[in-house]
Amino acid sequence: MAQSDAASGLRAGFRGLTTRGRSFLAAGITAVVCAYLLDQDALLRVGVLLSALPLVAVVVVANTRYRVASGRRLSPRRAIAGQEARVHLRLDNVSRVPTGLLLLEDKVPYVLGPRPRFVLDRVEPRGYREVSYRVRSDLRGRYPLGPLQLRLADPFGMCEVTRAFTASDVLTVVPLVQALPYVRLSGEWLGQGESHSRTLALAGNDDVILREYRPGDDLRRVHWRSTAKYGELMVRREEQPQKARATVLLDTREIGHRGSGPASSFEWAVSCVASVATHLLERGYQTQLLTDTGLAVPGPGAGGHNNAADTSGLILDALAVADLSDGGTLSRAEEPLRTGGEGLLVAILGELDDTQTARLGRLRSRTGGAIAFLLDTGTWAGLRMLAPGTGGDEFRARVRKLREAGWTVIPVRAGDSVPDLWRAAEGAKTTAPNREEAGA
């Protein structure tokens, strides 16, 4: 086994000969051949010396057995798209002998920048060295960092051997989160430590909270007045929830968005969802992310036990890898909203057809309050500039139908600011129609 390892090390050493080492070896062999043909002893000595240098370097580097350990630390572990993060590397010499020249190279995806390289001249026994580099990505996602590669080289630069560690890390680049102003929203009610006036969309004169009947509910809790009004069994919730609930719906349908890259309508929607969810968590809401694919974060088993920081991290991690779906409807998101959507619903929606608009209108009765950021995706595709009359009437019709169903609708166009639109949500029912007419 030892002989096999030695032979393997020598083969790796010969493969690691640098251009300088190969040149010296070729020149030395040539000089030896010429010295033999010309019977020149001096030239023979030069040839032997030139050949011996790279061969000795191969033997030395191949038999070098430094005991080193590496570590990596990310600051922060969740970076915001467009902002820098710093990666700290630490190399420990755990042996009793000093190291020679070490070349470090960390493996990073091209989207984060060029591969960082460092040269460490000497690390004393039981010593360590720390280096750091910066990474930056305009695209959200999860990017692997590592493994760290260690190159051993001789002092003359004749031979280099690469050895890789096995550990790697993941840098999560989350969408941009913008600070939103505090506004009073429809559907607010008594939250944790805050006095909210809740709009009971499903209640009658009694101060009760209602929801759809579920199998196993006590029939004595049926609220007959609301049952007659909505045409299906509605039951009272006897307990007052301790924490306000909110659901943020992200429309990921590819057919509902326009544009590509960071300037697309989908990326605007993802950033808007991140900002809204973070804002609601800061205000004490028990917040859940929901997509048209049925993805729910936190999942049904969470039970609301996560604190705001943990929930925010889960949602941002999910948004970091959110992608367009090939679905054509929002139907997979409707069932969770029907069964557990008594709180505030904030939906960031792409382009809708008549069927989707009607179904969203009917879904409004299941929520305590509903706000829709409806994206005019034609402005992302440049259609409004090329043909000003294209699609404008259809978009305004969708806005009108959702409002008639009880939604608070915020029309969104390319370039709009999320904080400004959020501020407009407080008085959207009276101000938004004027904005539409002005932008028509």
Q: How would you name each of these model-derived features?
A:
Residues A42-L44, A52-A302, L344-I348, R362:
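An amphipathic, basic-hydrophobic helix/alpha-beta surface used to engage anionic
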Residues M1-G71:
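Extracellular/lumenal glycan-associated context and N-glycosylation machinery
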Residues M1-R15, T19, T166, L176, ...:
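Exposed, interaction-prone extracellular/peripheral surfaces
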